[in-house]
Amino acid sequence: MSEITQTVRFASDRQLIVTEQVKRIFLFGNTTVDGTYKNITAGLETVKMGQVMGKVAATGKWVICKSAAVDGSAIPRAVSPEEITDATAAQEVLVSLIDGGEINKAGLVFNGTDTLDTLVGGVRMEDLLIANSRSLSLKTITDTAGFGNY
């Protein structure tokens, strides 16, 4: 949740201060990538807004990023800006995903017990992304190709 405070000044110099909480994941400067999401599970699958996504190397299809995957999709490459509900087994859906920009890291959704740390492995966090307590700036995987494990 982000807290937004607005100050409105009236002609008589009195102030009205409005504070509201807004669920905001995507903050600014976001870039998108279009592609196809494919449900590779045996049953229904829901991709939530903020879901961390990976890309299958052989097919180029987007799937939920899972640290145990061996098909290339264990690398976090993008974030879903919307919910994809009840995708049936093997269903393919055209998607537009966020692959760069600033997002609220509290809004990220991971698979199972995965965390950002389990997905990026030994790569130093400050090399992979610029983070602070409220948000992080995603970089595409090509931007991090020169970084080694520490």
Annotated model-derived regions:
Residues 1-150:
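Surface-exposed, low-hydrophobicity beta-strand/loop segments enriched in small/polar/acidic residues
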